[in-house]
A protein has these predicted regions:
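PAPS-dependent sulfation machinery
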Residues: 68-184
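Charged, amphipathic alpha-helical linker segments immediately N-terminal to NTP-binding catalytic cores
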Residues: 1-13
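PAPS-dependent sulfotransferase catalytic core
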Residues: 219-245
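Anion-recognition interface
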Residues: 188, 192, 198, 238-245
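Glycine-rich phosphate-binding P-loop
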Residues: 37-58
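N-terminal signal-anchor transmembrane helix
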Residues: 17-35
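Post-Walker A helix-loop "phosphate-sensing" segment adjacent to the P-loop in P-loop NTPases
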Residues: 56-66
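Conserved phosphate-donor/acceptor-positioning beta-strand/loop module used by diverse small-molecule
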Residues: 198-223
């Protein structure tokens, strides 16, 4: 697993460097964009709103699961689309295998519908530099993500500058890959601790904040985290915190 992960990360790094050869279709600076960011705690209804808006592809460019975890760069997306185009000429065996994996493996995830072609949280992009809340799913220790929960207050200025540039570059690459859409759309529970960062990068950004009854939200969040830790990690107690749900 470690070898496969290393190869995948190396391929992404090389592709990232090669993206500069493609140029940029958009002349606007990041600060001139008007992305829409959906904020809210885990299990507060953000996914439903996000995926509903994401269907309006004329206005919104939302990242899909495959774009986040398999192809965050433009070069990778062009390569995979080319492979699928050739695959289609031979009866699409690769596409069928992907759909089977999507249905049998990702479809088994509870609480939160997951699919390669579903709009998903771009917090997954921060797994590449290992610097986001999703690290918590693999290593469920509070100290592992403590600083990232309160990003604006606790992340050091030096690391913050690096991660800010990285996140803005990911958005630029995504917009360049989707010229049919006008605005970037994203939702993340982690945005609650990154409002200053988002406003700093995108002064013209728009925000939607969702609230849910705290008791119902907390119980749902505990159920989701219990499932996630069982699915991604190997806890001594199969569903930790389930008693709070």
């Amino acid at each position: 697993k470690r070898s496969r992960t290393t190869r995948s990360t190396s391929f992404t790094r090389i592709s990232w460097a090669c993206d500069s050869l493609l140029g940029d279709r958009r002349s606007a600076q990041p600060s001139e964009h008007r992305p829409l960011f959906i904020l809210g705690n885990f299990r507060s209804g953000t996914t439903f709103l996000y995926r509903t808006l994401a269907k309006d592809t004329e206005n919104f460019a939302a990242m899909k699961t495959w774009e986040i975890y398999l192809a965050p760069t433009r070069i990778q997306r062009m390569l995979y689309r080319g492979i699928l185009a050739v695959d289609a000429a031979f009866g699409a065996p690769i596409l069928r295998a992907l759909r089977r994996f999507d249905s049998e493996q990702l479809g088994a995830v509870e609480f939160h519908k997951v699919g390669l072609w579903e709009a998903e949280e771009d917090e997954g992009l921060l797994l590449y530099p290992w610097a986001g809340l999703f690290v918590w799913f693999f290593f469920p220790y509070r100290h592992a993500v403590r600083d990232f929960i309160r990003y604006d207050e606790r992340v050091t200025p030096r690391l913050r500058r690096r991660l800010d540039r990285y996140y803005a570059a990911c958005i630029e690459k995504h917009l360049a890959s989707h010229p049919e859409s006008r605005y970037y759309l994203a939702k993340n529970p982690s945005f609650c601790g990154k409002v200053q960062m988002l406003r700093r990068l995108y002064p013209n950004a728009r925000f939607v904040f969702l609230q849910r009854d705290p008791v119902a939200q907390f119980r749902s969040q505990m159920s989701w985290l219990a499932f996630a830790w069982d699915y991604f990690a190997d806890p001594m107690e199969r569903y930790p915190f389930q008693r709070f749900a």
